[in-house]
Design a protein with these regions (language model features):
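Metal-cofactor-binding active-site regions of metalloenzymes
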Residues: 2-289, 341-343, 347-352, 356-359, ...
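Metal/cofactor-centered catalytic core regions of large enzymes
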Residues: 270, 316-319
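C-terminal amphipathic alpha-helical interaction region
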Residues: 293-295
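Short glycine/proline- and charge-enriched loop/turn segments
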Residues: 308-316
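Divalent-cation-assisted or electrostatically stabilized phosphate/pyrophosphate-binding catalytic cores
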Residues: 322-329
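Short, basic/hydrophobic alpha-helical segments
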Residues: 332-338
Length: 467
């Protein structure tokens, strides 16, 4: 058994160890942004094997496997579960210094009690042991969530989703709150008129509202927004390449909407105008309902045409975009603030060039009424690793108030990803412990720093989202 994942992993001094073990380690988890499948939660899904629960749908691992020269047949193809796992075990040693190496061994330790290093020599034992445990009811979906002391999760849901699985969970509670998140990205897809028309027809069908113009679409969205609120929704989310803040009248938005609904492609300026208009209207809905809006900014998606046609989206072929965000972002939030339509907001950047940009953008629009109203969010996606977390925490500390931060989230499709909260907590305590050790923070203020750790890891999120 390896001592790699030990009680003091990443905790380099006595202050870091004290902060983590006394004020972070045992706190509940609020996972306010994830991509779990609600049906699997509602049905208390039993996983067939470790390959399904660990490798299925995990584009982080898929990218690493491809980078290690593993054929696609062992990744998304028809090879057996054991063969796919063996290829992952062969790849893990080559992921050293990639966050996958830490995540892999934290998950093995925390979920399965396995402290061995995963490599070809240990693959058989680990595969068999994990599958033996997964055959037990103690390793079904709901049990895994309770195992990690998860208090609340927020899934990611389209406005046309029925939320039937959330309803079923609420009717048969199991100790974890599972709430929907409003993600209306498809209503911004006016640059693909064919699919946009199909989506509007779907929205019309579920609301019973005949949608012929822009105001009809807003009425239908408001009806679904109200329904999401009734189902416990407290957050919205937008995944975008950049911000949009073009001036657009209601009449212009209606004309552009009707143009797309007739199957015509709007020009680039019209696309930007429409996206700007609907984002402002959606933000106003969120503000009125007291929700928190999230903006995940900066991916360029589906870049490998051959593989996109073969596998579809979200399969490991996205990357970091380099569009400017500052001017449009500030103009967008300035409009909302001027019209008193700016509610709680979290900003996430994917391109590290935008780290300080986003941190300062957030703190330009606080109103002096709600502590931490505008948040610079956790390191996201390609930046969700130790270096990225430290840079995000340092930027927030230098340009805002770390003490008001709402903390970590998994952004994951996997029920095994909750150790990412532990990883964040250890890194946070390591940084603060180093500051105390070096004299940058006063040891005399340890009681407040302990409180600050607990706030960041749990209490701030609970209060901020009103869970």
């Amino acid at each position: 058994m390896s001592t790699f994942i030990n009680p003091d992993f990443l905790l380099g001094n006595k202050f870091a160890r004290e902060l983590y073990h006394e004020s972070a380690e045992n706190l509940p988890i609020i996972d306010y942004h994830c991509h779990l499948i609600p049906q699997q939660v509602a049905e208390n899904h039993k996983f067939a094997d470790i390959t399904e629960v660990w490798l299925g749908g995990d584009h982080y691992k898929w990218r690493a496997l491809r980078g290690n020269g593993v054929d696609e047949d062992y990744i998304t193809g028809g090879r057996s579960s054991r063969e796919k796992f063996e290829k992952w075990a062969e790849t893990v040693p080559y992921t050293m210094r990639n966050p996958l190496y830490h995540w892999t061994h934290l998950e093995l330790a925390r979920v399965f009690g396995i402290y061995d290093i995963l490599k070809p020599e240990t693959a058989d034992y680990i595969y068999n042991r994990c599958n033996e445990l997964l055959a037990s009811d103690d390793f079904r979906a709901q049990s895994l969530m309770k195992k990690f002391n998860v208090e609340t999760v927020c899934t990611t849901d389209d406005p046309t989703d029925t939320l039937e699985w959330h309803k079923r969970i609420a009717e048969k509670p199991f100790g974890v709150n599972v709430l929907p998140t409003w993600r209306p990205d498809k209503m911004l897809g006016i640059d693909d008129p064919e699919n946009f028309r199909k989506y509007v027809a779907k929205l019309s069908g579920i609301t019973g509202i005949m949608i012929s113009g822009y105001q009809d679409a807003l009425d239908a969205l408001q009806k679904r927004h109200d329904f999401f609120g009734q189902m416990g929704c407290r957050l919205s989310d937008h995944g975008m390449d950049t911000f949009y803040a073009e001036d657009c009248t209601r009449e212009e938005a209606d004309r552009i909407f009707r143009k797309a609904m007739q199957g015509q492609m709007p020009d680039c300026k019209e696309i930007a105008k429409f996206k700007s208009a609907i984002l402002l209207d959606l933000a106003a809905m969120d503000c009125k309902s007291g929700w928190t809006q999230q903006f995940h900014i900066g991916p360029i998606r589906n870049n490998n045409r051959k593989m996109f046609e073969r596998l579809g989206p979200d399969t490991g072929f996205d990357a970091i975009d380099d569009k400017p965000v500052a001017a449009a972002g500030h103009k967008f939030f300035s409009k909302l603030a001027y019209e008193d339509n700016l509610g709680k907001t979290i900003l996430y950047n994917l391109n590290p060039k935008d780290t300080e940009v986003m941190a300062t953008m957030a703190y330009t629009f606080n109103d002096g009424k709600t502590a931490g109203k505008m948040q610079y969010g956790a390191a996201w996606w390609f930046l969700d690793q130790e270096d990225g977390m430290r840079k995000q925490l340092n930027a927030l500390s230098s340009l805002g108030l770390l003490s008001r931060f709402v903390g970590m989230l998994t952004d994951s499709r996997s029920f095994l990803s909750y150790p990412r909260h532990e990883y964040f907590r250890r890194i946070l305590c390591s940084m603060l412990g180093d500051d105390i050790q070096s004299g940058r923070l006063p040891e005399s203020e340890l009681p407040f720093i302990h409180k600050m750790v607990g706030d960041i890891c749990y209490r701030n999120a609970k209060e901020y989202f009103q869970f």
